[in-house]
From Swiss-Prot:
Domain of life from the UniProt record: Archaea
Role noted for this protein: Prenyltransferase that catalyzes the transfer of the geranylgeranyl moiety of geranylgeranyl diphosphate (GGPP) to the C2 hydroxyl of (S)-3-O-geranylgeranylglyceryl phosphate (GGGP). This reaction is the second ether-bond-formation step in the biosynthesis of archaeal membrane lipids.
Cofactor: Mg(2+)
Protein's name according to its UniProt entry: Digeranylgeranylglyceryl phosphate synthase
Listed PANTHER family: CHLOROPHYLL SYNTHASE (PTHR42723), CHLOROPHYLL SYNTHASE, CHLOROPLASTIC (PTHR42723:SF1)
Family stated for the protein in its record: Belongs to the UbiA prenyltransferase family. DGGGP synthase subfamily.
Pfam families: UbiA (PF01040)
Source taxonomy: Archaea, Thermoproteota, Candidatus Korarchaeia, Candidatus Korarchaeales, Candidatus Korarchaeaceae
Pathway entry: Membrane lipid metabolism; glycerophospholipid metabolism
Keyword annotations of the record: Cell membrane, Lipid biosynthesis, Lipid metabolism, Magnesium, Membrane, Phospholipid biosynthesis, Phospholipid metabolism, Transferase, Transmembrane, Transmembrane helix
Length: 281
């Protein structure tokens, strides 16, 4: 696909799709009304996220040359300037659309558009603060959808907390996966600072916290059989399998496998949250 394929790759469409699902999840768990605001709300997060991915690749070009030489910039398929232009264009488009949703939504979108620049240029190299910002961005897709629907619910707040801890786990595992390039360029990730073994223990503890948060909606009877089946019974064992790899001290050699397990767990968990309002029992 050439240049167009590189543009698509740098925007990471799979992540963009997840942001749409997150926004939709926040909406359907807050209201039963489906109108034009829903379409608008689902368009904005992927625009901002794709912009963030582009600026991230812009500043990560040298590191990616070691860790991921197949990425669009180090492979020479697009230039750094083109990546910067993508960030600017998509950010401005997302901010412009948010004006039609309301002032709070406009502030959130503007804040995250600027935050992704700050993350790519400075925060990513600080380790945990950068990981926390990325995870907050994932969690806020649900909150954004709920706010756009006009009714931020307790259930969505719990769901967004689960999204935050789950993604933080994935960020820590990715830090282990990217360890060679990060060490070479002085990036102070959690894995560089405390080592792979301690990072694995931290991932396990965060997994336990995620389990507790995931079960809370069931305890408070906020959810039904779909959430229980997908988000609890199926998703959580996969997460704990990934965390068991970390606890056994095998994270460094199985980082990619662990990351894949976490992504599957996150998707199933989110799917349960999304479909739960449509339960029949």
């Amino acid at each position: 696909m050439g240049k167009l394929g590189a543009y698509v790759e740098i925007s990471r469409p799979k992540n963009a799709l997840m942001s749409i699902l997150g926004t939709l999840t926040g909406w359907v768990n807050s209201t039963s009304v489906y109108d034009g605001r829903l379409i608008l709300a689902c368009l904005i997060p992927p625009l901002v996220l794709m912009a963030g991915n582009a600026i991230n690749d812009y500043y990560d070009a040298e590191i990616d040359a070691i860790n991921k030489p197949y990425r669009p910039i180090p492979s020479g398929r697009i230039s750094k300037r083109e990546a910067l232009n993508i960030y600017i264009a998509l950010s401005l488009f997302g901010i412009a659309l948010s004006i039609f949703l309301g002032f709070i939504e406009f502030l959130i979108v503007t804040a995250f558009s600027l935050s992704w620049y700050a993350y790519a240029r400075w925060l990513k190299r600080t380790g945990v603060p950068g990981n926390a910002l990325v995870s907050l961005g994932v969690a806020f897709t649900l909150i954004f959808g709920s706010l756009a629907a006009g009714n931020l619910t307790n259930k969505v707040i719990i769901f967004s907390s689960v999204a935050f801890t789950s993604n933080l786990i994935r960020e820590f595992v990715k830090a282990v996966e990217d360890l060679p390039g990060d060490r070479a360029h002085g990036v102070r990730t959690i894995a560089v600072r405390i080592g792979v073994k301690r990072t694995g223990i931290l991932v396990f503890l965060l997994s336990l916290a995620t389990v507790v948060l995931t079960i809370l909606p069931v305890i408070f009877r906020l959810t039904g059989i779909i959430y229980l089946s997908l988000s609890v019974i199926i998703s959580l064992p996969i997460l704990m399998l990934a965390s068991a790899i970390c606890l056994k001290g095998k994270l460094e050699e199985r980082a990619r496998e662990t990351s894949s397990l976490i992504k599957v767990s996150m998707f199933l968990g989110l799917l349960g949250m999304l479909l739960d309002p449509f339960r029949v029992v």
